[in-house]
Amino acid sequence: ENLPDFDTESDESRAIAAMVADILGAQADTAAPKLIIGEGRNMKNAKVYVAEQTDATTNTKTNEAYVSNKVIATGLSANTVYYYSYEKEDGTYTEPAEYATKSTNNYSFIFVGDPQIGSSNELKGSDTAEFYQAQSDAVRNDSFNWNTTLNEAMDKTGGNASFVVSAGDQIQTTKKKSPGKSEMTSEIEYTGYLSPDVLKSLPVATTVGNHDADNANYTYHFNTPNSSDLGSNGVVGGDYYFTYGNTLFMMLNTQDTNAAEHKQFMEQAIAANPNCTWRVVTLHQDIYGSAEHSNEPEITNLRYTLVPYFEANDVDVVLTGHDHAYSRTHILEGGHKTVEYTDDEFDAELDKDMDAGENPATRYEAPANISADSKEPADVAYLNYLNAVMDKDAIEDTEKGETVVNPDGILYMTANSSSGSKYYDLVPRMQSYIANRWQEDVPTYSVIDVTDNTFTINTYRTDNDQKIDETFTIKKGVTEDIKSASVGKVKNQIY
């Protein structure tokens, strides 16, 4: 049995629990379990909810059938301690676990990238004892680090984080690369992902990554409020959104690259929530990142199809993952494609430029093996492409500072690995659009604090609890400390 996962929607009035139960034998004979939730340890005013149960998948080797059980608990109040318990297969109930709702006024959330539990397994998927043992060892190690990251992040907030946002790739093994293309191979990895005790009481909003996208097993473990068919890749569902306090979070499944559908989804989500102060988009691919994937044509092509829609819908912040290295951009506006290229161009040049040579473990930044003065036609075309996707003209303010006031553009942030299961080197030529980046092969996490007029980001490494970047704040509105400025309208100011 896996631990419950909670998600939040609309000012803590709803909590969503997803329980995946391992049921032996015929699923038709298995009654849907119940969840009980009430106030305080004595579960005062307890409510009972019967799970919505659906068939999940079957382990063809053991004939173990799995079902997915999901519950929506309604009417929860902010700043209240609840306890919940759910029914097990034998009819008994779990020990009550605490779930404390938080404030929806000034609040904090944790942002992480690519836990990718199981990725430290270097063996390719095969139906062998060696593979399954290596996978088990990797899950153990990656889950330990994932647990450490979540605990440190929660401690950093004083236990007050309202939820976690994950930028995708919860697990490693895709269905395509599983032995026999089995849906079940990833189950041990989801068990590892859900194993930290803190997740009994910490809601998680997940994003679909490329390692999640081809296996419906993802959908059996997570709830996605206000889900849409728009952005669906036909396997794990489409885009979804939720609101928390003054913020609209729009979670895009960009494994479907149909930008028009994502545009339509965002317009619908905003129309349903027009008064939110902050608009945050989360997607997997690092469309403005700075590590190995960031210069790939398929990533930059996705950038130029999505960015105009983000800007037209007044998105404030875009949170991404995929590249297992931290980066934060300048405020950007108006990035657009200036040269034509296809998704599969420059593969050889990208590999050559990023090749770290004989000692890759000692490098955190690729060595730039293609010289700027190369006369090779393929190299010249590649370097011209890199220059075109630097987006120098999109930088709203190139000064480095801690606070940006009333920006017109968007901040893009890419999360490093949160488990240490895999890292990528930074590209050798830092893009013009990057304000700061970091890679030292240590897991990191970000704590984001939100108020009515500020959105503040701090990012930490887990080995020594130190920040890897300065505190960065977006501020909306003219505040007392800048009212004396001798301009009619304060915009794009950094101080």
Model-predicted segments: where are they?
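Divalent metal-dependent phosphoesterase catalytic cores across multiple superfamilies
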Residues: 1-207, 213-236, 260-271, 294-313
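Short hydrophobic/aromatic-rich beta-strand segments that constitute the beta-sheet cores
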Residues: 35, 84, 251, 456-459
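Extended active-site neighborhood of metal-dependent phosphoesterases/phosphodiesterases
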Residues: 73, 81-98, 133, 178-275, ...
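Generic beta-strand structural signal
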Residues: 111, 166, 243-244, 450, ...
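Active-site metal-binding loops of divalent metal-dependent hydrolases
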Residues: 111-116, 168-170, 210-211, 254-255, ...
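Conserved acidic residues
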Residues: 162-164, 277-279, 316
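Extracellular low-complexity, Gly/Ser/Thr-rich intrinsically disordered linkers
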Residues: 247-248, 283-287, 431-471
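C-terminal cell-surface addressing/anchoring modules of secreted/extracellular proteins
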Residues: 487-495
